[in-house]
A protein has these predicted regions:
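Bacterial N-terminal signal peptides that target proteins for export
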Residues: 2-15
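Bacterial signal peptide processing site
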Residues: 27-30
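Active-site catalytic motif of lipid deacylating hydrolases and related acyltransferases
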Residues: 38-118, 222
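Serine-dependent carboxylesterase/thioesterase catalytic core
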Residues: 69, 73, 80, 98-192
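C-terminal catalytic-base region of ester-bond hydrolases, centering on the histidine
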Residues: 167-257
Length: 257
């Protein structure tokens, strides 16, 4: 008896289907199609720490404390944490970077889970403090939460408000000094006090305990002396670093597994 090739193929496929159904019935389990490697893997997005520089300072100027803090964090968190610094004019660029980091499945859009899994910390000095709040507001429109914002002698830009912290921010802190032609805002407030905790508005006075800030440009030390002193104050950045670390993954102790 002769069988066509098409008939044999159909017969083989039917036999395979009967076998699969039989195995499923015996085990009580439905046999699912096998996934390709990585199909159900959803990697966790990194924690994100972004800093903004004040004035017209370059994003990688090593003299400035914001850049130094970022370098220290990169050294101690080589994986699992994305640390970057930006000029205060690059809020939109920083937002795009965040969207890229959160898109863990690389499908070009953020799911609710990807948004809610965000762990974002933003800090900045002077106009960088304004940029900190501006980025947090942009992320609020995207439905993305922010763990912490840190403003150091924050100065509003072009009359834009940098004192009202958006409701997507969990915690916010403000360090300021009130002297000189350029000085920070003395009081930040939560747009929604039930969702945002203001850790404090902390005032600093460098008249009694002046700082040299020898590495900073002479014009900063001359024209905006107090504003520069708060930026180069190691106490400020030690406090900021402590708050940031509290919201980052714990570094395993040496020798631990």
């Amino acid at each position: 008896m002769r069988f066509s090739l098409t008939f044999l193929v159909r017969l083989t496929s039917a036999a395979a289907l009967i076998f699969i159904i039989g195995v499923s019935g015996c085990t009580g389990k439905v046999v699912a199609a096998r996934s390709l490697p990585g199909d159900d893997i959803s990697p966790k997005a990194p924690a994100i720490v972004f800093g903004f520089l004040g004035g017209f300072v370059a994003h990688d100027d090593p003299v400035h404390a914001e850049v130094q803090l970022a370098a220290q964090l990169r050294k101690e968190f080589p994986t699992g944490v994305e640390v970057e610094t930006f000029e205060n004019t690059h809020v939109a660029r920083a937002r795009q970077q965040i969207l890229k980091f959160l898109d863990t499945d690389r499908d070009g859009m953020l799911s609710k889970e990807e948004k809610q899994g965000a762990r974002i910390i933003i800090y900045g000095h002077s106009w960088g403090g304004w940029a900190t709040v501006a980025l947090a507001r942009a992320l609020e429109k995207d439905g993305i939460p922010v763990l912490l914002t840190i403003q150091v002698d924050s100065v509003s830009k072009r009359g834009r408000n940098d004192t009202l912290i958006p409701a997507n921010v969990a915690q916010a802190v403000n360090y300021y000094q009130p002297f000189g032609i350029v000085h920070g805002d003395h009081d930040i407030k939560a747009a929604d006090a039930t969702r945002t905790r203001i850790l404090g508005n902390y005032r600093f006075d460098y008249k009694k305990s002046p700082l040299n800030c020898a590495d900073y440009p002479w014009y900063d030390r001359f024209f905006v002396k107090p504003h520069t002193q708060i930026e180069c104050d190691p106490e400020i950045w030690a406090k900021a670093e402590s708050l940031i670390r509290a919201n980052l993954p714990q570094i395993p102790a040496k020798g631990s597994k």
